[in-house]
A protein has these predicted regions:
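Interface-prone segments of viral and bacterial extracellular assemblies
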Residues: 1-347
Length: 347
């Protein structure tokens, strides 16, 4: 998170009562910690205490009467004020979006003039990278599934948080497994939101910063997220590197690969199910050092109807936060038998 001058919108006359803000709480990703504290310091801390983590929050300005908000955190002994946070650029999705949508229409857009190329924005649990915004058509262009996240489907109405540079980070260190409660107390020129009126956001720490990035640009038989396959399962992917991806242009999930983070392994799990979703067989493979894997149809169980593929990275016992997971059908299950003989009789 870079140092920026706080943005305060023009205050218009109206109700100056502090209102509850729509907000998002998150365990701070590695890239944000690097920008906040420097990579050497962060890496040293994680080397000594790999399970430590930090928490943050971003909030949407309720109206122009609101100046900023205070982040309050409860680690079990009651709420303490931890830091201030500036309200972030925000919007809502006008329509549902799928895995592939990199341009989509927004509504309820506020303060998008603050966003710059490569700024991180978040929709639900997916981090995207800002590319551009057409203010006339309200169309946002992004890169999908950045850093330790993967592309997800999002429903219309989902909130878009442009929290890069506009969030509050608690500088206390927490450990994996700790359960925290966070609140954003908004401030106007004459009022502060009561603690009891602010929405509680619960968060469980999971060692996010130390975990390797997942594989990206995963294809099954040369397709992204296919609904079915008809023959051998051919999986391809590219690698990501948490330590390397700390500057320059942000890589989206569909971009090319980089050298994998040192000491990181790539594991593949293929599970076969019959028509009743009963597990028939599970095959696991260490595919480190490669970028493709073929599972022959002849090696599949005769009654296989659906297949689940999980592709993940592991380093020093820590799995990636968001592995690639996809389930699809084996269409040959529905094929007509090829070895039937017929007898024709005259009537």
């Amino acid at each position: 998170m870079q140092s920026v001058v706080e943005y305060v919108p023009p205050i218009t006359s109206g109700d100056s009562t502090a209102k509850n803000a729509t907000a998002i709480a998150f365990e701070v990703p590695y890239i944000e910690l690097v920008e906040q504290y420097g990579q050497d310091e962060v890496d040293t801390k994680l080397l000594n205490y790999p399970e430590l983590g930090y928490v943050g929050m971003a909030a949407i300005r309720p109206n122009n009467q609101h100046v900023n908000a205070s982040l309050y955190v409860d680690a079990g002994a009651g709420y303490d004020e931890r830091t201030n946070l500036d309200f972030c650029p925000s919007a809502s999705l006008k329509n549902d979006i799928g895995y592939f949508d990199s341009s989509f229409e927004l509504e309820n857009v506020t303060e998008f003039e603050l966003l710059e190329v490569n700024h991180r924005i978040q929709v639900n649990d997916e981090i995207m990278a800002f590319v551009s915004f057409d203010a006339v058509k309200n169309v946002l262009n992004v890169k999908r599934g950045c850093f330790d996240t993967v592309p997800q489907k999002h429903d219309a109405g989902s909130k878009v948080f442009g929290w890069d540079n506009y969030s509050g980070i608690d500088d206390l260190e927490y450990l994996s497994g700790e359960v925290l409660s966070l609140k954003a107390l908004t401030l106007t020129g004459s009022d502060i939101l009561e603690l009891s009126e602010a929405t509680t956001h619960s968060l469980t720490l999971s060692s996010r910063a130390i975990r390797p990035y997942p594989p990206a640009n995963v294809k099954i038989n040369e397709e992204y997220f296919p609904q079915e396959i008809e023959t051998d399962l051919i999986l391809t992917w590219v690698d990501r590197n948490r330590l390397q991806q700390t500057g320059g242009e942000i890589l989206g999930w569909f971009d090319g690969g980089v050298a994998i983070e040192p000491n990181t392994q790539t594991h593949l799990i293929i599970t076969q199910f019959n028509e009743n979703q009963i597990e028939l067989a599970t095959n696991s493979a260490n595919v480190t050092g490669t970028s493709s894997y073929t599972f022959s149809i002849s090696a599949m169980q005769p009654d296989t109807r659906t297949i689940e593929v999980i592709l993940k990275t592991v380093r020093d016992g820590y799995e990636c936060l968001n592995p690639f997971v996809h389930i699809f059908e084996l269409s040959t299950f529905f094929s007509a038998p090829y070895n039937i003989t017929y007898e024709v009789k005259e009537l």
